[in-house]
Every structure is written in C-alpha cells, then in structure tokens.
Amino acid sequence: MKIGIVTTWFERGAAYVSRQFMDILAKNHEVYIYVRGGEEYAKGNPKWDLPNVYWSNGLHTTYINKKEFYKWIKANSIETILFNEQQYFTPLVWCKEWGIKTIAYVDYYTEQTIPLFGIYDSIVCNTQRHCSAFDEFDDIHYLPWGTDIDLYKPKYTDGRLVEEGKVIFFNSAGMNPLRKGTDTFIKALYKCKELNSIRAIIHTQVELKQFFPELSSVVAELESLGILEVVERTISAPGLYYRADVYVYPSILDGIGLTVPEAISSGLACITSDNPPMNEFVHDDFGSLIPVTRLYARKDGYYWPQCRCDIDALANLLKKYASNSAKVVEMKKKARKYAIDKLSFEKNASSLSDIIENTK
C-alpha cells in the first residue's frame, strides 16, 4: 500500500512521532511524507530531507493548498493518509471526494472540534487520556506510546551516576520552555542552591530569556555557582539524556510528554507532573510525581486544562534525590528495565500497519 503522512518535519516532538510511524510502516508499505507548515523547515538537512519527502509551500499552520496537495497524491498514487496533529479540516473533505482513506493521529482538539474527527476513517491515540476524549467514536485505536529503546539508551548499563558523587538533573525545554515547566524547575533549583551535590542541565532550542526575562538573574546566579548549565541549540536525537541521572519535567500541558519515555529509556530516574499523560509513564520504583496546585484553561480552548506544579514540593524532591545517590542508581536501572519491557515503540506500534490496512 502507498501511504502518505501529513506532518511538520524537523527537530521537534511532532516530527519524531511521524518519523517513527514512517519507519514502522515502511517495513511493509511505501511511505511518503507531505511536509505542511510548522515552526521551521529542515529542508537541506540530510537527516530530514529524504527522497520520499515533499516540502510544500506551507505557512506556519496546518493549512494545505488543494492543488499542490492533489498533485502530490496523484504523483505518488497515495491510497491512505495519516494526518499528524492536523487542525485544518478542509483537506479531509477533499480526501473524501478523491476516495482517499484518512487516519488521524490525535494530539490537538477542543470541545468544539472533537465532533469533526468523525470525518476520519480511523483514529489513533497514543495515551489513555486521548482515548477517553474520543471514546464515543467507533473506529478508535489505542497504541501505547513508546520510543526507540536502541537509540535512547543509558551511558552506563549498571546505572552508575554520570559524575561520581553528584546527581545531575536534566530538563528538556524544546521549543517552548513555558509549556515544559522549565521556569518551575529553575525556581525549585534555586531553592536548592546551598546543596554542594546538586547539578542541573537545561536544553532549550530557544533563548530562555525570551520566555523568562524575570528569571535572568536567577539563571545567571545558578550558572555562576556552577549548579546550572544551559544549552541553547538544536541537538539531534538521542539528545543530552546521557549527561544526566534524573529527568525533571514539570510540564504544564502535553499531548504525549514525548521526552518522558525517552528519558526513561535512557536510564534516567524521572520526576514529572502528577497529571496525564505524564503520570501514565512514571512509576514509584523509578520516579516521583510532583503535586499539582492548580488546573486552568488554555486561552485557545484546548480540551484539557493546563496544570501548575508545586515548586516547594519539587524542590524537596530535588533535595531528596541529590542526597540519596545510591537510591538514584537503583532507580536508573529500574527505569531502563521498564523501558525494555513496556516502552519499545517497535513493539507497541506493531499493529499500526494492520490498523491502516483494515481501515474502511
């Protein structure tokens, strides 16, 4: 079967999801990528600019030009299209007219747009939370999310600390440090600045000062004390997990919380928000959940509320982990074992090909 995937396509979470779908489906089918708009384009990047990739003249939205889209479908004899995080629904009407089967990978939706997903022939959800929002639909499929456990793997197989005598914490801020709770992490870390054994790394694809100008002096002080290192650039997978022992992710809102399974697979203990979908992945034997102090709506009307984590509770967890390195070592080993048992994307998504083939 010839399958198309409509997606953003560069170094970011949504594109990694599409790439993993492509790799799984390519074992039995011909897969073609239609790159719609997004924050960036990776055209010219040998990792992303592949022979099966078509770069549309898209905008920074999920808008699609009808003539251009139809030309791509015809040129590749596309039979079925998987849409990743599609918010512009008109192309679904076109696909109905053209006899193309459509499958939604669910991530973004509001109370008003959920009924619109009925136009799809099939719906794929990667978290229990997403499934619960679409439980009235007939052709819905739950594929537990996972990751590439061979790519994301520990630096040391015995769970030892990256740097002897120091527990190193890590936060991946990506393109949106506010949504990833990076400010909460910084504030909690500042409450731990008297601890000699604590170190932290923040990886961000944008400048922190753009998002948190009010925290500039705090970040500068933590850097001057040798507690915090901020890495501001795009880094390809498997990222910087190998440099840390504990992943800290006080996210305020996520579709999957993609970096959490990546961190677990990399053999990191995990501290994250006690809110779905993050708390679907983290268990007591290799991590901790941060109490949520507030739930509040997002201004664009996204279906699920945002959350705010308790900064003092997070600070106490950082202190607890930093002062108990032996426990952290055991948690790291258990994290990797859990990933091998439960988080293999190749295993978890093995039924995706069947779902697509059986979509009517």
List each model region and its residues.
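Short hydrophobic beta-strand element within catalytic cores of glycosyltransferases
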Residues: 269-272, 279-282, 288-289
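Aromatic "clamp/platform" in nucleotide-sugar-dependent glycosyltransferases that forms part
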Residues: 252
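Acidic anion/phosphate-binding donor-loop and adjacent secondary structure
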Residues: 114-115, 146-165
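Donor nucleotide-sugar binding/catalytic pocket of nucleotide-sugar-dependent glycosyltransferases
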Residues: 121-154
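Short alpha-helical donor nucleotide-sugar binding micro-motif in glycosyltransferases
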Residues: 117, 234, 239-244
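Nucleotide-activated donor-binding/catalytic signature segment of Leloir-type glycosyltransferases, i.e.
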Residues: 212-235
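Conserved donor-binding/catalytic core segment of Leloir-type glycosyltransferases
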Residues: 6, 160-180, 186-190, 201
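A charged, aromatic-enriched C-terminal amphipathic alpha-helix characteristic of glycosyltransferases
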Residues: 308-309, 313, 323-356
